[in-house]
Structures are given as C-alpha cells and as structure tokens.
Curated annotation (Swiss-Prot):
Functional note: Involved in oxygen transport from gills to the various peripheral tissues.
Quaternary structure annotation from Swiss-Prot or TrEMBL: Hb1 is a heterotetramer of two alpha-2 chains and two beta chains, while Hb2 is a heterotetramer of two alpha-2 chains and two beta chains.
Protein name, UniProt field: Hemoglobin subunit alpha-1
One annotated GO molecular function: peroxidase activity
Residue numbers of N-acetylserine PTMs: 1
Pfam families membership: Globin (PF00042)
Length: 142
C-alpha cells in the first residue's frame, strides 16, 4: 500500500505534470498500441488507431482524467475508482493485465517528458500508485 511519503510524492509530481496530462495520455496510449499491438483489439471500432490519431488523443485524455481522479482519491482508490472499475469490467470488458501495460507506458512517457522531476523516489512512488490504480480498477472483476 501507499505510505504517506508515497502519497505526498505522487501529489507533488502530479502538481508538476498534471497540466501536460493530455499529452502524456496521447503518448502513452500511442506507445501501448505500437509496442503491444494486441491492445488494438479494444479499439477496433475506431476508424483510425494510428499513434496520435484523434481517437487516441481523446482516449488518452480520458485515461489521464481517470489518473487525475485517482490522485484526488489516493486515500481510498478502491472506493474512489469503483465506477471506473465497473465500467472496465462489465461494459468495456478490458483484460486487467492491460492496466499494467498502460501503466508502464505512462511511466516511460513521464520519465522522458519530466526527467528532472522523475527522481528514483518519484518513480517508486508513482509505480506503486499506478499499481494501486490497476488493482482498484480490477476490483469488479472478482
């Protein structure tokens, strides 16, 4: 679980990177569909799934909106992300293993966009936080 120090580190990092959330989401989702092409199956209803397309940008923005929500609900991710968990489990039917894949892409993008802020301590705390988000999103699958 997240310590108070982890929570503080995530909040501090988010305060610096939050205004770039749309760009982070676009880049992370674009990387995911290139590096893990099997994830394209969830977006087969889109006319264009190429990196940086309008649909990728819009969904990247939506994903990062979910991350922003998670930051605001950091003290109780399970309850705070309950609606998103239900949506991903029952409506979208996303394999929860993909949350880990996208988390990795988000970490890569943040590390390249914000190298000075992405300290080893920030990396560990953000990784733990994103793992907690993935676990909370997978809650309704049980």
């Amino acid at each position: 679980s997240l310590s108070d120090k982890d929570k503080a580190a995530v909040r501090a990092l988010w305060s610096k990177i939050g205004k770039s959330a749309d760009a982070i989401g676009n880049d992370a989702l674009s990387r995911m569909i290139v590096v893990y092409p099997q994830t394209k199956t969830y977006f087969s209803h889109w006319p264009d799934v190429t990196p940086g397309s309008a649909h990728i940008k819009a969904h990247g923005k939506k994903v990062m909106g979910g991350i922003a929500l998670a930051v605001s609900k950091i003290d109780d991710l399970k309850a705070g992300l309950s609606d998103l968990s239900e949506q991903h489990a029952y409506k979208l039917r996303v394999d929860p293993a993909n949350f880990k894949i996208l988390n990795h892409c988000i970490l890569v993008v943040i590390s390249t966009m914000f190298p000075k802020d992405f300290t080893p301590e920030a990396h560990v705390s953000l990784d733990k936080f994103l793992s907690g988000v993935a676990l909370a999103l997978a809650e309704r699958y049980r």
